[in-house]
């Protein structure tokens, strides 16, 4: 019997990406599947903290084993920014990927060091215990957007060892090499080991 796990996200892109990575290893439930329509605040100062806020909220309120992630783009020459604020980097209400990318590109104008990394932290609450998993992929920010697939900063991030952005590589390749894939694969290995 497959283990049921709630993935605490309302982000359809993330849900699709993680579902593709997990395959048939677990029965993945979304927040909609459990009738959770609460916007869980991400008020922590770290990716790990935000992931924990979401997973623990579901475990406390629904009694279901759950995992949640938070991802940040960390740019070396910007002191790790946008980091935990990646989804709302440009300010304003909601998540505006286009505005976030434009702000990032503007802040990097004239900078030679464009090294960056995507980092995903996953908090799993399983039978009252918390487990943390992390995935990191290094790369660089290019000067203009390229590609049509993916979401967020994918059109401006070129992972190390590649000459195309995540948005140009497409979901199949991205789902094998991304920061989220690395973290989710660690989660899968852990689930297989218990």
Swiss-Prot record:
Cofactor: how and how many bound: Binds 1 Mg(2+) ion per subunit.
Keyword field: Hydrolase, Magnesium, Metal-binding, Nucleotide metabolism, Nucleotide-binding
Cofactors (names): Mg(2+)
Positions with a binding annotation for substrate: 9-14, 71, 151-154, 174, 179-180
Reactions catalysed, as given in the entry: XTP + H2O = XMP + diphosphate + H(+); dITP + H2O = dIMP + diphosphate + H(+); ITP + H2O = IMP + diphosphate + H(+)
GO cellular component term of the entry, any: cytosol
Function: Pyrophosphatase that catalyzes the hydrolysis of nucleoside triphosphates to their monophosphate derivatives, with a high preference for the non-canonical purine nucleotides XTP (xanthosine triphosphate), dITP (deoxyinosine triphosphate) and ITP. Seems to function as a house-cleaning enzyme that removes non-canonical purine nucleotides from the nucleotide pool, thus preventing their incorporation into DNA/RNA and avoiding chromosomal lesions.
UniProt similarity note: Belongs to the HAM1 NTPase family.
Name of this chain's protein: dITP/XTP pyrophosphatase
Species the sequence originates in: Bacteroides fragilis (strain YCH46)
Species lineage: Bacteria, Pseudomonadati, Bacteroidota, Bacteroidia, Bacteroidales
């Amino acid at each position: 019997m497959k283990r049921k796990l709630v993935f605490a996200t309302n982000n359809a892109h993330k849900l699709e990406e993680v579902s593709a990575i997990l395959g048939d290893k677990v029965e993945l439930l979304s927040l909609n599947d459990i009738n959770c329509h609460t916007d869980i605040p991400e008020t922590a100062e770290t990716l790990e903290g935000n992931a924990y806020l979401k997973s623990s909220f579901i475990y406390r309120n629904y009694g279901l084993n759950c995992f949640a992630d938070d991802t940040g783009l960390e740019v070396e020459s910007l002191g790790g920014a946008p980091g935990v604020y990646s989804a709302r980097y440009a300010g304003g209400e909601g998540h505006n990927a286009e505005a976030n990318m434009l702000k990032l590109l503007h802040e990097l104008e004239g900078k030679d060091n464009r090294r960056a990394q995507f980092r995903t932290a996953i908090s799993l609450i399983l039978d009252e215990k918390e487990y943390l998993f992390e995935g990191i992929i290094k790369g660089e920010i290019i000067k203009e957007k390229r590609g049509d697939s993916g979401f967020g900063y994918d059109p401006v991030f070129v992972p190390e060892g590649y000459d195309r952005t995540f948005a140009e590589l497409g979901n199949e390749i991205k789902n094998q090499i991304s920061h989220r894939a690395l973290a989710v694969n660690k989660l899968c290995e852990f689930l297989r080991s218990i």
